[in-house]
Swiss-Prot record:
Keyword Signal: yes
Keyword field: Signal
Lineage, opening ranks: Bacteria, Bacillati, Bacillota, Bacilli, Bacillales
Domain called SH3b: residue spans: 30-104
Gene3D superfamilies per record: SH3 Domains
Protein name: Uncharacterized protein YraI
Family note: To B.subtilis YraJ.
Database matches in PROSITE patterns: SH3B (PS51781)
Signal peptide residues on this chain, from the entry's feature table: 1-26
Length: 119
């Protein structure tokens, strides 16, 4: 019985690792960049009418999980209505989710590089 209990606990622990880290493992990281070197606004939704939740220093690498279309923006990498859903870890350790215009992220593509957000 003790062996079965240990095996069950091990199975739960391994499953937890995959469930809770699959989001981070699936993400590719890309560099945020502006022509002026100014920070980029991360917003609560896919457009300039959404509130700013934090800023991201130019040169920072952040993950992209999915994208939504929104306000058309012109930035360092062209003009686009693609907004990448991402997150930034603050110095305090807090993880802040939000959207960044694709025009300020070097992805190597004029189109989406991740699936569309399903929510």
């Amino acid at each position: 019985m003790n062996k079965l209990k240990r095996l069950s606990m091990l199975t739960v622990m391994i499953a937890s690792v995959f469930i809770f880290s699959s989001h981070a493992l699936a993400a590719q990281y890309y560099t945020v960049s502006t022509s002026s070197g100014a920070p980029v606004n991360m917003r609560s939704g896919p457009g300039t009418s959404w509130g700013i939740v934090t800023t991201i220093p130019s040169g920072t690498r952040i993950p992209i999980y999915c994208y939504k279309t929104g306000t058309t923006v012109t930035g360092k990498y062209g003009t686009s209505n693609i907004w990448n859903y991402t997150e930034r870890t603050l110095a305090s350790g807090e993880i802040v989710p939000g959207f960044v215009s694709d025009t300020y992220m070097y992805t190597g593509s004029d189109g989406p590089v991740v699936p569309k957000c399903s929510w």
